[in-house]
């Protein structure tokens, strides 16, 4: 049985850990509220943008703009992998990395070259351990970012696609469904799919007839690159919110585990102290009996 001092030290250590996990839970909760507000503000714009651009693209031939062109032979696949920069968020990062690596393995098995575009340290570190090229590795970005981050990634993948260095682009990110549910999603980014095939957020059914001026071709040249960046930004926002929700849940579970451990150690402490008292009493009684004899 451990000594009383050892048990006291363990209890003090667990209490300090509990303070840390509780503080991290509160920080994650505050950051999650901010991330949710950003998503709620952005989603209506994104939904209308998807609806309008999908209608616009359906009126044009795929040969009008190279971003609409579906290539007959896919030689190189670009995977944009969005993860967090830090851990302590349960299985959040491992789920995203597993999804991306499975996708990369599938593409490689089909004879395609794979390039990773990583945002977040966890995804970057995992991608560097593979045999695939890491064309972009951005770290310390997910804590605080704006549309410029999506713009930077978008310009890279668009230029690579137009230069035929990439033939398709897929984004792997964490979709924020609820506080308790975050899903790893593999979303095709390029080539841009027609409206009926689009893997975009569902928008309310609309019977609006759009009138486009000037010509459709000119509008597509301006709007298609922005559409790519909007998709990337939405994925980054979802990943950020999912990270904070996952960390909040992980820290809540850790705090509960600390409470359970403190309870068990306190019980052990009481048992150890009681055993010590019993031994002392037995020694006293034994000594008294010896004196009588």
From Swiss-Prot:
UniProt entry tagged with the keyword Membrane: yes
Which domain of life does the UniProt lineage start with? Bacteria
> One GO biological process from the UniProt record?
proton motive force-driven plasma membrane ATP synthesis
Q: Where in the cell is it found?
A: Cell inner membrane
SUPFAM superfamilies per UniProt: ATP synthase (F1-ATPase), gamma subunit
Q: Name one GO molecular function term.
A: ATP binding
Self-association state and partner proteins as the record states: F-type ATPases have 2 components, CF(1) - the catalytic core - and CF(0) - the membrane proton channel. CF(1) has five subunits: alpha(3), beta(3), gamma(1), delta(1), epsilon(1). CF(0) has three main subunits: a, b and c.
What family does this chain come from, according to its entry? Answer: Belongs to the ATPase gamma chain family.
Protein's UniProt name: ATP synthase gamma chain
Source organism per UniProt: Nitratidesulfovibrio vulgaris (strain DSM 19637 / Miyazaki F)
């Amino acid at each position: 049985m451990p000594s009383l001092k050892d048990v006291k030290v363990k209890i003090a250590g667990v209490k300090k850990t509990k303070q840390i996990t509780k503080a991290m839970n509160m920080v994650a909760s505050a950051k999650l509220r901010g991330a949710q507000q950003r998503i709620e503000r952005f989603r209506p714009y994104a939904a209308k943008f998807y609806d309008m651009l999908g209608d616009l693209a359906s009126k044009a031939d795929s040969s009008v703009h190279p971003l609409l062109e579906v290539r007959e032979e896919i030689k190189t696949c670009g995977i944009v992998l969005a993860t967090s920069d830090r851990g302590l968020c349960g299985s959040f990062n491992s789920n995203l990395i597993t999804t991306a690596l499975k996708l990369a393995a599938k593409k490689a098995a089909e004879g395609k070259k794979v390039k990773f575009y990583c945002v977040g340290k966890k995804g970057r570190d995992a991608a560097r351990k593979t045999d695939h090229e890491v064309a972009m590795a951005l770290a310390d970005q997910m804590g605080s970012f704006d549309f410029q981050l999506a713009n930077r990634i978008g310009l890279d993948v668009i230029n690579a696609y137009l230069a035929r260095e990439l033939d398709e682009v897929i984004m792997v990110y964490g979709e924020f469904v609820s506080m308790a549910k975050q899903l790893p999603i593999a979303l095709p980014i390029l080539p841009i799919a027609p409206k009926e095939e689009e893997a975009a957020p569902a928008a309310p059914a609309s019977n609006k007839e759009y009138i486009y001026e000037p010509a459709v071709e000119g509008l597509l040249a301006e709007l298609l690159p922005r559409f790519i960046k909007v998709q990337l930004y939405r994925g980054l926002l979802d990943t950020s919110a999912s990270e904070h929700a996952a960390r909040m849940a992980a820290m809540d579970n850790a705090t509960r585990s600390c409470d359970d451990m403190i309870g068990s150690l306190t019980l052990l402490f009481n048992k150890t102290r009681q055993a010590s008292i019993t031994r002392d009493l037995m020694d006293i009684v034994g000594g008294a009996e010896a004196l009588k004899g």
